[in-house]
Amino acid sequence: MGYLLWLVTAYVIGSVPFGLVIARTFCSVDPRTGGSRNVGATNVARLCGTGFGVLTLVCDVLKGVVPVAVAMTFSDSAVFFSLTALAALLGHLYSVFLGFRGGKAVATTLGVFIPLAFTPLLVSALLCALVIWRSGFVSLGSLTLVTALPLMLLITGNFTYIPLALVVMTLVFWSHRENIGRLARGEEKPWQKKKHKEHE
């Protein structure tokens, strides 16, 4: 019963739309109606500035870290940790506070894997950053992250969380399906180029 209650709690924590709260509180804008119409850090940064985007990123990462880290204090079950991680991710993707809509779960993916598999995550995150830096596409970097993660888990011998990483990869690819379509058509907006144009 206690485990089930924590899974529900993890979902609720994951559901908190920090991007919406931050954008409304500090910028008086609704990220659901501006920019990419997403409540994630990238869109908040577009609409409110980099600082508020970073704040949103940190909060969304913590939505993943906290539920898993707390679960690890009262359980030693990798299956339970994986279920807790998925509950937090599903909360972010399908927030009870947003009519079961939400973000794209990349920041929260970072969060859930920090306590579970830090080294594979770090390598994957560096690859993600490199792709974003070289291409300007945050979406492409995000897809690189979740694709690299199960491979890094395999390479480092951390087989326990490969199933979780594969499920997460599927969820993140699904949440980016519109971005993938725009990338394929050459219509995706590069983050860096967009920012450069805004300052010209």
Curated annotation (Swiss-Prot):
One Gene Ontology MF term: acyl-phosphate glycerol-3-phosphate acyltransferase activity
Membrane topology: Multi-pass membrane protein
A biological-process GO annotation: phospholipid biosynthetic process
Pfam families according to UniProt: G3P_acyltransf (PF02660)
EC number: 2.3.1.275
Keywords: Cell inner membrane, Cell membrane, Lipid biosynthesis, Lipid metabolism, Membrane, Phospholipid biosynthesis, Phospholipid metabolism, Transferase, Transmembrane, Transmembrane helix
EC class name: transferase
TM regions (residue ranges): 3-23, 52-72, 78-98, 112-132, 153-173
InterPro entries: G3P_acylTferase_PlsY
Entry annotated with the keyword Iron: no
GO cellular component entries: plasma membrane
Pathway: Lipid metabolism; phospholipid metabolism
Catalytic activity from the UniProt record: an acyl phosphate + sn-glycerol 3-phosphate = a 1-acyl-sn-glycero-3-phosphate + phosphate
Protein localization: Cell inner membrane
Binding partners and assembly: Probably interacts with PlsX.
Function: Catalyzes the transfer of an acyl group from acyl-phosphate (acyl-PO(4)) to glycerol-3-phosphate (G3P) to form lysophosphatidic acid (LPA). This enzyme utilizes acyl-phosphate as fatty acyl donor, but not acyl-CoA or acyl-ACP.
Family stated for the protein in its record: Belongs to the PlsY family.
Stated name of the protein: Glycerol-3-phosphate acyltransferase
Lineage: Bacteria, Pseudomonadati, Thermodesulfobacteriota, Desulfovibrionia, Desulfovibrionales
